[in-house]
Regions:
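Conserved N-terminal catalytic core of the sugar/cofactor nucleotidyltransferase
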Residues: 1-7, 15-21, 28-29, 33-108, ...
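Active-site glycine-centered loops adjacent to acidic/histidine catalytic or metal-binding residues
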Residues: 11, 110, 138
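Alpha-helix/helix-capping structural signal
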Residues: 11, 58, 180-181
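A structural signal for short hydrophobic beta-strand segments in well-ordered beta-sheet cores
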Residues: 27, 148-150
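A short acidic, often aromatic-flanked loop/helix-cap motif at beta-alpha or helix-coil junctions
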Residues: 85-88, 141-142, 165
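Catalytic-core segments of class I nucleotidyltransferases/pyrophosphorylases
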Residues: 105, 119, 126, 155-207, ...
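Conserved donor-nucleotide/metal-binding helix-loop-beta segment in metal-dependent transferases, i.e.
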Residues: 115-143
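Ala/Thr-enriched low-complexity intrinsically disordered regions
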Residues: 210-212
Length: 217
């Protein structure tokens, strides 16, 4: 059963400049709450109580103020600084002391998830014993994302990052769950052409029989 989660709140937020000139994108307000509150709330609804926030340098105080008293929320939070943007899987490497050889969930701090059956679906996937779970959604422009391709038995065949051609319209979202092997698998990754570790490459290291996809319409 997954009991811990990583929330990714780093990055440069370059596409939202100048709003992100002096503050992380995930701290920007959406209605009456900072952006990161929404993915955090989703995981809290699913029973997660221990978190590590991956943040940029000199941002811990800002996130602490935005979060408020974690005891009032009934959660425990640690902050880990990502010194440079080395890709999503780097979060597992720098959080290995937090993970402690356990299964873990990871969510992007700037993503929004909504659906009538979403929480039950996620709770079910949090019973993960081995392998990994990814959450997929249909897209009209799949080539702009990581695309999940299936075999004839509707099992995940492979995941391709921004393919030029594909017969699938299922894209990966910003929520993942991995078993205790994730830290060791991350060590096997090599930087892509972008000079970053790619989440797609990490998922593809898990045996096909242990990869599962979830979708809430």
């Amino acid at each position: 059963m997954i009991k811990k989660a990583i929330i990714l709140c780093g990055g440069t937020g370059s596409r939202m400049f100048p709003l992100t000139h002096s503050v992380n994108k995930q701290l920007l307000p959406i209605l009456d709450k900072p952006m990161f509150y929404y993915p955090l709330s989703l995981l809290m609804l699913c029973g997660i109580r221990e978190y590590v926030f991956i943040i940029n340098k000199n941002q811990e105080n800002n996130f602490s103020k935005a979060l408020g008293n974690e005891n009032d929320l009934g959660i425990r939070v640690k902050f880990v600084v990502q010194e440079s943007p080395l890709g999503l899987p780097d979060a597992f490497s720098i959080s290995r002391k937090f993970i402690k050889n356990q299964s873990i969930a990871m969510i992007l701090g700037d993503n929004f998830f909504f659906g009538s059956m979403l929480s039950p679906l996620i709770r079910k996937s949090f019973k993960l014993k081995s392998g990994c779970n990814i959450y997929i959604y249909p897209s009209n422009k799949p080539s702009s994302y990581g695309v999940v391709e299936f075999n004839k038995k509707n099992k995940i065949k492979k995941i391709v990052e921004k393919p030029k051609k594909t017969n699938s319209n299922s894209i990966i979202t910003g929520l993942y769950t991995f078993d205790k092997n994730v830290v060791n698998f991350t060590k096997k990754l090599k930087p892509s052409k972008r000079k970053e570790l790619e989440i797609v490459d990490l998922i593809n290291l898990f045996p096909p029989s242990t990869r599962a996809g979830g979708q809430d319409d």
